[in-house]
From Swiss-Prot:
Post-translational modification: Binds 1 heme c group covalently per subunit.
GO cellular component, one term: mitochondrial intermembrane space
Chief location category: mitochondrion
Keyword Transferase: no
Name this polypeptide is given: Cytochrome c
Biological role: Electron carrier protein. The oxidized form of the cytochrome c heme group can accept an electron from the heme group of the cytochrome c1 subunit of cytochrome reductase. Cytochrome c then transfers this electron to the cytochrome oxidase complex, the final protein carrier in the mitochondrial electron-transport chain.
Length: 111
């Protein structure tokens, strides 16, 4: 199912998901350094593999996807299927509500 059919996202629930599943490798804080994964500040509207100062896989750079709700919704279902060769070792979020919630949080937290 596509993002058009996704349930409304709850950013508070999304923040909990971020803290438990994403924060060990990513930060959303402006000006913060990269962790194991890139800083996600300014994520929306950015092309994959282009954050300054982070060493991306060739797969991530070559995918050249623009991050927005729709692309993140598909990516977060199964990152390794969406970008084969990605360095991200996250299995994905299978539940549409979890993906919608996380995206709602990221939209606020990375702006």
């Amino acid at each position: 199912a596509s993002f058009d059919e996704a349930p409304p996202g709850n950013s508070k629930a999304g923040e909990k998901i971020f803290k438990t599943k994403c924060a060990q490798c990513h930060t959303v804080d402006k000006g913060a350094g990269h962790k194991q994964g890139p800083n996600l500040n300014g994520l929306f509207g950015r092309q994959s593999g282009t954050t300054a100062g982070y060493s991306y896989s060739a797969a991530n750079k070559n995918k050249a996807v623009e991050w927005e709700e729709k692309t993140l919704y598909d990516y977060l279902l199964n990152p390794k299927k969406y970008i084969p060769g990605t360095k991200m070792v996250f299995p994905g979020l299978k539940k549409p509500q979890d993906r919608a919630d996380l995206i709602a949080y990221l939209k606020e937290a990375t702006a």
